[in-house]
Amino acid sequence: MVGTLDMDFTKYSALAVEDDAGGMAIIGVMMRYLGMQAYLNTTGDGVVELARAMKPRPDVIFLDINLPKTNGYEILKKIRTDEKLKGVLVVAVTAQDADTEIPKCMAAGFDGFIGKPISRSRFPRQIRRILSGEPVWETY
């Protein structure tokens, strides 16, 4: 699969923040299958600190919008104001209504949007596009 996507994923790292076990499993398995270094967080607590401590720094953060103690918009604000995390791509991942959430995510400064449920067949290509600098704003 890696060869067909024409990208060496092994040089990239990602952080996925997702409170749903099923969604987390799909994201984690897909990133690891591609060869990416993957870190997972299920609550949203300490995301900025975790991202800052990652070695290497994450290239992309997949961030759920609805988390138990906070939301993706609040976490994004913290990421965007952190000097050490400047330039990290942040992609919203949510099951919320795309027609409502995509404009909000764009306005908030997300680098992309992937709707749930995550498609196992499309997710690797979405990751490739994101890491190549192409915005992804897709409902699934």
Spell out what each predicted region is.
Residues 56-62, 67:
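Active-site beta3 strand of CheY-like receiver
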Residues 35-44, 48-50, 114:
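Short hydrophobic/Thr-rich beta-strand motif most characteristic of the beta2 strand and flanking loop
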Residues 21-40:
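Two-component/phosphorelay signaling modules centered on CheY-like receiver
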Residues 68, 86, 98:
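The feature encodes the CheY-like receiver
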Residues 18:
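Conserved acidic carboxylate
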Residues 91-93:
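Hydrophobic/aromatic residues positioned on beta-strands within the core alpha/beta folds
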Residues 1-15, 28, 57, 121-140:
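Non-catalytic signal-transmission and effector/linker regions of two-component phosphorelay proteins
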